[in-house]
Amino acid sequence: DFEYFVHQYPVELAYCLALIHARSRYSITPRWVLKNYPVVENIMHMLRGNPCLAGCSYCRHSLDIHGALKRYFNFDSYRKYAEEALQENAVKAAVTNKSILAIFPTGGGKSLTFQVPALMAGENMKALTIVISPLQSLMKDQVDNLEKSGITDAVTINGLLDPIERAKSIERVENGSACVLYIAPESLRSKTIERLLLGRKIARFVIDEAHCFSVWGQDFRPDYMYIADFIKLIQREKQLDDPIPISCFTATAKQKVIGDIKTYFKDRLSVELELFAANTSRTNLHYEVYNNGNDEEKYNVLRNLIESKDCPVIVYTSSTHRAAMLAEQLREDGFDARAYHGKMDVKQKKENQDAFMAGKVRIIVATSAFGMGVDKKDVGMVIHYEISDSLENYVQEAGRAGRDENITADCYVLFNEQDLDKHFTLLNQTRLNQK
């Protein structure tokens, strides 16, 4: 391959060699070079992103996934699931440019599994990894957690940002100081995002909460179905010879959902996803159900549970109205509580999330909008004031507790027969009828 590029693309090869020896870590290939010399991406990938012969000093250091884990996150080893090295194997597969589907339990380290290869690609190839996530709270949480670890290479572009913050994120992607970009699937229809990604070498597309692909999943998101079309557009515009690798992650997936995800990428992009599935349970979670007769009794149980343990608490409700009302009632009774739901003012929602994540507020009363991917290690209690609308959603939401394996966390459901009627009514309201 090297001899071929020497003879056929000497200018592109010379450029890549010069870029490799640039002193600045954030030196990237300008957009006009990518557009006029598309082979540059292939050469850069061959030189810096492909493991080569045994004994190569570059590969031994820069493509060493254990060294990267220690360098970026100061961990000595990858997490095992029932003595299986699934996390390590998934990272290794990504670094060797395979497309994967990883099913890890909540709190099982799935974020680190795609962050290590993304940071390595940014450092080695000046490349950008795009992480597609369904929730704004998840994106912000991930970026904040990386910054706490001293990693400032990630940015997000979403509706929670004001115009100045959005402009700064775009600038950082353009100038190469960001190598990880978190966006929502809806953003893929934006011409700004399209232009932004065409101006960078793309290392990989990561799809978080991949169960949103499947009509069999409770969180089906139609915008996820556009992802393959967008990737195909980027590949065509960049004139790429090889498909951009893809990583899909989810914590809960039925066999039908797994089949849907794999079939989607096989049919749309001719990409085979290698499966990494963990068969393990969360042994540090304690589950209990309280059967309550009326609202007053239920609220008293809620108060008693919160008072019984001094720890961060998430209280889930099924409606925005209930979340706001319950948070206010708890505050009136002397508890440090705030609400979080989809109908809140964007600024207020961001402030409430920040306060809870930083430990300034002990209790967050939320709808499922405060769900997937929220990563606060010390949550010691999750209380469902009303039952979830599916078992899958319950596993996701209860899994917010006890993400630190060294603590024991409690998951309570305050059950009332009337809750089932509420969910049945909501389901009927969303049904399409032909008249």
Please state what every model-predicted region is.
Residues 1-60:
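N-terminal accessory nucleic-acid engagement/regulatory domains that precede
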Residues 3, 7-11, 77, 89, ...:
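Intrinsically disordered, low-complexity Ser/Thr/Pro-rich tracts
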Residues 81-83:
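Conserved SAM-binding loop and adjacent beta-strand
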Residues 130:
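ABC nucleotide-binding domain signature
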Residues 45-74, 85-89, 95-101, 105-111, ...:
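Helicase motor core with emphasis on the C-terminal RecA-like subdomain
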